[in-house]
Amino acid sequence: MRHYEIVFMVHPDQSDQVPAMVERYRSIVESSGGTVHRLEDWGRRQLAYPINKLIKAHYVLMNVECGKDELDELTSAFRFNDAVIRNMVLSRDEAVTEPSPLAKGNEKREDRKESEDAE
């Protein structure tokens, strides 16, 4: 099995369906012995340029270890899901488990907000 980094963007009106989508995609990966090494929900973020007249999207990052058949099933699930605006699959040499720089930045912001609220 190979390691992949997957990022997909969901239509902002469908943000409440993201947990169900993630569980469905996780079950596809784990159905034949694959594993999800990292799963990060980056939330709604501004797009660099409009896509289908949208300026925001809900981002999700997954680092998975799976076979080619599961990856093909995942990409076809992305393709046929109208809520998924864009997706990107990158092949990795090894599993990435540490938090991404974007997730680390979100944690720092949350810590600052909590300290400001405590004062």
UniProtKB/Swiss-Prot annotation:
Gene3D superfamilies for the chain: 3.30.70.60
CDD domains: bS6
Alphabetical keyword list: Ribonucleoprotein, Ribosomal protein, RNA-binding, rRNA-binding
Source superkingdom: Bacteria
Region (Disordered): 95-119
BP terms from Gene Ontology: translation
Keyword Transcription regulation on entry: no
One GO CC term, this protein: cytosolic small ribosomal subunit
A GO MF term: small ribosomal subunit rRNA binding
Biased composition (Basic and acidic residues): 105-119
Pfam families: Ribosomal_S6
Keyword Ribonucleoprotein recorded: yes
Stated role: Binds together with bS18 to 16S ribosomal RNA.
Family: Belongs to the bacterial ribosomal protein bS6 family.
Designated name of the protein: Small ribosomal subunit protein bS6
Organism encoding this protein: Halorhodospira halophila (strain DSM 244 / SL1)
